[in-house]
């Protein structure tokens, strides 16, 4: 019996050590798990954005880099908040469509992503997001916010702190820590995760009309995140759920055809 007790104790201690090691690994490597910034910087000259320009925007003690195109007269400007991977320029086909339909845009890399130097953190991303909005506001056009995936967090935060015409959230999380808890249900992510992006709290202060777009086939951020976040919006406009669509499928699925009338409705409001 004594031997069995010792074996049981040893197994318990081993389980504790393994669990502690898993928690320690997550804590030490959490930003490497959360962000995928590596990738090429797309040259503006290699796109069809003939009237866009490269811009450098002061943000905190550094700066962020992006592209800007002014809207057609009387049209609004989309401030675009990218996801957690690679560089903003890889989505140039979206910006080309915005411009073709008369919309202006500002898109950029958060600090620590390919086009903008620095270290990645939630505080830095939120500071960059506000700096981009404030820079765009100085241009004088009405502003529309579009946040995709990770970008839904800073877009929601900015909408809670500034006045825009509309907030579009594409494949958003309820919060980043919600997604982490879904992926690692046996780890105390609420205690150890630094960059939690609590959109579920920020959205309470969002007065702009909100469109949430998501797909039922999204295995990166489950569609329930978008549905739950939309339910919390004080000024919900529309919820667009695409059957079978994955995390990166909504542009091809026609999100722009949903976004344009949403933006037009928002612009028509006083």
Q: Where would I find each of the regions flagged by the language model?
A:
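C-terminal catalytic histidine-bearing segment of alpha/beta-hydrolase fold enzymes
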Residues: 227-270
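Short beta-strand/loop motif that positions the catalytic acidic residue
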Residues: 205-207, 212-214, 218
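Membrane-embedded segments
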Residues: 63-135, 139
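An N-terminal hydrophobic leader/cap segment in hydrolases
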Residues: 15-56
């Amino acid at each position: 019996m004594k031997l069995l007790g010792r074996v049981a104790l040893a197994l318990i201690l081993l389980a504790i050590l393994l669990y502690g090691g898993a928690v320690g690994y997550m804590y030490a490597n959490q930003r490497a798990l959360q962000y995928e910034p590596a990738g090429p910087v797309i040259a503006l000259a290699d796109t069809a954005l003939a009237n866009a320009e490269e811009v450098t925007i002061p943000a905190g003690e550094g700066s962020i880099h992006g592209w800007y195109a002014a809207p057609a007269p009387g049209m609004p400007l989309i401030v675009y908040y990218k996801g957690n991977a690679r560089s903003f320029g890889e989505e140039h086909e979206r910006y080309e469509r915005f411009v073709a339909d008369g919309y202006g845009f500002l898109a950029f890399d958060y600090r620590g992503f390919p086009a903008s130097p620095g270290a990645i953190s939630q505080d830095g991303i939120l500071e960059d997001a506000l700096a981009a909005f404030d820079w765009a506001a100085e241009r004088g056009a009405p502003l529309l916010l579009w946040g995709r995936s990770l970008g839904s967090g800073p877009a929601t935060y900015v909408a809670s702190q500034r006045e825009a015409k509309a907030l579009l959230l594409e494949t958003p999380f309820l919060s980043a820590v919600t997604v982490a808890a879904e992926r690692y249900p046996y780890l105390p992510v609420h205690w150890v995760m630094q960059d939690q992006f609590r959109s579920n709290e920020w959205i309470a202060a969002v007065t702009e009309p909100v469109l949430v777009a998501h797909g039922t086939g999204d295995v990166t951020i489950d569609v329930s995140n978008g549905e739950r976040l939309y339910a919390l919006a004080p000024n919900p406009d529309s919820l667009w759920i695409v059957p079978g669509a994955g995390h990166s499928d909504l542009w091809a699925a026609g999100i722009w055809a949903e976004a344009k009338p949403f933006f037009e409705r928002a612009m028509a409001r006083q």
